Structure formats: structure tokens, C-alpha cells
Amino acid sequence: MSSLIASRRYAWALLSAAEEGQFLDQATDALNSIKETLANSRDLVHVLRSPLINGDKKTHILEEVFKEIAGEKVMIFLRLLAHKKRAGQLPEIIGEYQKLLDEKNGVINVSINSAVMLSDEQAKDLVNKLANYTGKKVRAKMKLEEALLGGVTVKIEDTIIDGSVRHQLQMMKKFLLAGKL
């Protein structure tokens, strides 16, 4: 089984158990804290992925590192991952969990690149329009990209909406070279 499929299945299992057991908020908070810890500790991720370290040792490491932040139900899940030799996939499982939770809650991640910094009002207006366009709640990640020359580009999953001056100039060049203008 590919690691992505396995990660998604483990994430789905935890999400389902958290919903049924009514500890969804606690599990989500714990996983966010674990994700942050893993992002700040490459050594820990390396240890969890190492085939040289057995499952019992990984279980002990997970318990020592996360017992304060994980809570008992999430710790059971972490022990299961170590037992099933999937502890090394913990970062991917957390990522898949977040994606599944976002799907469940109707949230979509959007990247917005602009040539100039948008004002709070402009950003809020753009996010509202994107929410209307997608029919979902929008979690926007704003980024300044001066190479656009002007305008914005928006990436929604696999779709890119390019309203930049750079893109318009490229299209004009293409039409001029093709003799279509």
C-alpha cells in the first residue's frame, strides 16, 4: 500500500474515532501541537522514520515527547502507529487529517499572490468573493510577489486564476507573434 493511501486511511480512522468519541477538538489541537513539534525537530522525524529503531522504542519516544500535549486517546493512536510501523508517516498522517477535516468543514486553502500588499479591506473583499465563487469557507495565504508587475494570482487547489499584468503582457505578446491582434 502506498504511503499516501496509508496516511489517508489512518487520518480518516482517527477523524472518525474523534467524531464518534466526541473528542474532535482535542484531537485536532493535539495534532496541531504535534505537527509544530515535528516541524521544529528534524531529528525526531528522522528517528520515527528509521528502520533501525524498533516499534517499542518508537512507542516510548512518542510517549515521552507527546504525553503532555496529546491526551490519552491521541496517545493510543500514536502507539498504534508505532506498533504498525507507521510512526514515520506521522507528519503525512497529520497533513491528511487536516485535509479531511477541511473537507468535512467545507474549508478550502487558497494562495493569493499580489504585486503590492493588499489592504485589509481589499484582502477581506477578495476572500469573500472567493468564498462566493467556491461555495466554501476560504483559508487564504497571502504572499507578495513583485514580479507580477500588477494585479493578483489566485491558486485554488489545481486551478489558477491569473489576473496579473505580467500574464496579460505575455498573452498580448503571444497574440502579436501569432498575428492575431
Curated annotation (Swiss-Prot):
Q: Name one GO cellular component term.
A: plasma membrane
Keywords attached to this Swiss-Prot or TrEMBL record, sorted alphabetically, are: ATP synthesis, Cell inner membrane, Cell membrane, CF(1), Hydrogen ion transport, Ion transport, Membrane, Transport
How this chain assembles, per its entry, is:
F-type ATPases have 2 components, F(1) - the catalytic core - and F(0) - the membrane proton channel. F(1) has five subunits: alpha(3), beta(3), gamma(1), delta(1), epsilon(1). F(0) has three main subunits: a(1), b(2) and c(10-14). The alpha and beta chains form an alternating ring which encloses part of the gamma chain. F(1) is attached to F(0) by a central stalk formed by the gamma and epsilon chains, while a peripheral stalk is formed by the delta and b chains.
Query: Matching Pfam families, A to Z?
Result: OSCP (PF00213)
Which function does this protein serve?
F(1)F(0) ATP synthase produces ATP from ADP in the presence of a proton or sodium gradient. F-type ATPases consist of two structural domains, F(1) containing the extramembraneous catalytic core and F(0) containing the membrane proton channel, linked together by a central stalk and a peripheral stalk. During catalysis, ATP synthesis in the catalytic domain of F(1) is coupled via a rotary mechanism of the central stalk subunits to proton translocation.
Where can this protein be found?
A: Cell inner membrane
Tell me the gene name: atpH
Family matches, as PANTHER family: ATP SYNTHASE DELTA CHAIN (PTHR11910)
Q: What is this protein called?
A: ATP synthase subunit delta
One of the entry's Gene Ontology molecular-function terms is: proton-transporting ATP synthase activity, rotational mechanism
Q: Which SUPFAM superfamilies match?
A: N-terminal domain of the delta subunit of the F1F0-ATP synthase
Asked whether the UniProt record includes Amino-acid biosynthesis among its keywords, one would answer no
As for membrane topology, the entry says: Peripheral membrane protein
Q: Organism source for this protein?
A: Chlorobium limicola (strain DSM 245 / NBRC 103803 / 6330)
Q: Which domain of life is it from?
A: Bacteria
What family does the database annotate?
Answer: Belongs to the ATPase delta chain family.
